[in-house]
């Protein structure tokens, strides 16, 4: 829809750096939301708005969705005139009056399945705490999503989290669709270390504490891992934890943490071979793993002759500097952030001869 002169003026005003002394002007102009000013800025050719309810900033379409969810008709009109796609609002429109307004502003009566999936994944694109919490609030238990087959969206989520799903078996068809979505948002929060979002899910869903622990292991988030295991006392079998840590390659911090906590490093070595993870394999050797014959047999069985050849060498030794007990995540991160395996270097030198 074509913007009015009034909405264009408001758009220019929202893009200015306005001092606190002049906030009353913004309030008089309707640029006020949740007891704070609405600010606007452009990032990578996309319009973002910021207010007290979204201190980190959100994309304009997502701001529209929140305004629709709150039945805030003035902001629905304003954001639409600023360029928001009113069809995004239809996802959140739960009252007849608001749905009618969205249609008046150009929304389709019926959104195709593919378009709803597009809206879903476009909305999750910005990995901030504000946005992930909002996605959870908008999409979980949303009757408008019944338009699509939940199996479609479930399948997309399962694909995005496929590595995690293969080892945890916690996101299966016995879960309600709402639970699947919650686990999805929670996993994103842990993967991107979104502390406010992590805190939100942790307090709201005590039954998913183990899920958070699994995500911390899988995504190599040693800070979250330490907080859960040592401070919050969330527990799993330590070898099971190590198994999850070894599934993604170069997960040095999570592997080291589990090793220090008593996990079997030879079992970790075998899991790394099972998953074709050369980086993890040599890191386990650096930590003292020595299941060479068993590992070689496993590699040959899986047809991975590069790893089998690597395990045939007799020149590997534990790295003494790694064997000191360090549990502070800051120190672990500093120690391993740019770590290069000494034993992998030995193997690569041998290969180049």
Curated annotation (Swiss-Prot):
Coiled coil feature spans = none
This protein's record includes keyword Hydrolase: no
Q: Which GO terms describe its biological process?
A: symbiont-mediated suppression of host cytoplasmic pattern recognition receptor signaling pathway via inhibition of IRF7 activity; symbiont-mediated suppression of host cytoplasmic pattern recognition receptor signaling pathway via inhibition of TBK1 activity; symbiont-mediated suppression of host toll-like receptor signaling pathway; taxis
The alphabetized UniProt keywords are: Host-virus interaction, Inhibition of host innate immune response by virus, Inhibition of host IRF7 by virus, Inhibition of host RLR pathway by virus, Inhibition of host TBK1 by virus, Inhibition of host TLR pathway by virus, Viral immunoevasion
Top-rank taxon, per record = Viruses
> Which Pfam families has this protein been placed in?
ASFV_360 (PF01671)
On whether Nucleotide-binding is a keyword of this UniProt record, the answer is no
Which InterPro entries does the entry mention? ASFV_MGF360
- Relate the protein's function as given in its record: Plays a role in virus cell tropism, and may be required for efficient virus replication in macrophages. In addition, inhibits the phosphorylation of host TBK1 and IRF7 and thereby negatively regulates the host cGAS signaling pathway and antagonizes IFN-mediated antiviral activity.
Q: How does it assemble?
A: Interacts with host TBK1 ad IRF7.
Q: Which family does it belong to?
A: Belongs to the asfivirus MGF 360 family.
This chain's protein is named: Protein MGF 360-11L
Q: Which organism is it from?
A: African swine fever virus (isolate Tick/South Africa/Pretoriuskop Pr4/1996) (ASFV)
């Amino acid at each position: 829809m074509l913007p009015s002169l009034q909405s264009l003026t408001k758009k220019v005003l929202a893009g200015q750096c306005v001092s606190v002394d002049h906030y009353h002007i913004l309030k008089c102009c309707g640029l006020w939301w949740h007891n704070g000013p609405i600010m606007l800025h452009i990032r990578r050719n996309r319009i973002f708005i910021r207010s007290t309810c979204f201190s980190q900033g959100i994309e304009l379409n997502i701001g529209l969705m929140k305004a629709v969810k709150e039945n805030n008709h003035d902001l629905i009109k304003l954001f639409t005139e600023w360029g928001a796609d009113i069809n995004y609002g239809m996802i959140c429109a739960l009252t007849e009056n608001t749905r009618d307004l969205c249609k008046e502003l150009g929304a389709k009566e019926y959104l195709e399945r593919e378009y709803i999936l597009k809206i879903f994944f476009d909305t999750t694109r910005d990995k901030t705490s504000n946005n992930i919490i909002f996605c959870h609030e908008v999409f979980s238990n949303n009757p408008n999503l019944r338009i699509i087959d939940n199996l479609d969206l479930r399948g997309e989520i399962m694909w995005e989290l496929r590595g995690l799903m293969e080892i945890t078996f916690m996101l299966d068809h016995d879960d309600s669709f709402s639970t699947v979505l919650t686990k999805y948002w929670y996993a994103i929060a842990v993967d991107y270390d979104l502390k406010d979002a992590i805190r939100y899910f942790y307090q709201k869903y005590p039954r998913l504490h183990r899920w958070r622990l699994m995500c911390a292991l899988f995504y190599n988030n040693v800070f979250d891992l330490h907080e859960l295991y040592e401070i919050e006392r969330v527990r799993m079998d330590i070898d099971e934890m190590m198994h999850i840590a070894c599934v993604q390659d170069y997960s040095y911090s999570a592997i080291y943490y589990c090793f220090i906590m008593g996990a079997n490093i030879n079992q970790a070595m075998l899991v790394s071979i099972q998953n074709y993870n050369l980086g993890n394999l040599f890191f386990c050797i650096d930590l003292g793993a020595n299941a060479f014959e068993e590992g070689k047999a496993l590699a040959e069985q899986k047809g991975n002759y590069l790893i089998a050849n690597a395990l045939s060498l007799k020149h590997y030794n534990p790295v003494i500097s790694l064997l000191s007990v360090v549990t502070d995540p800051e120190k672990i991160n500093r120690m391993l952030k740019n770590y290069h395996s000494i034993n992998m270097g030995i193997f690569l030198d041998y290969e180049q001869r």
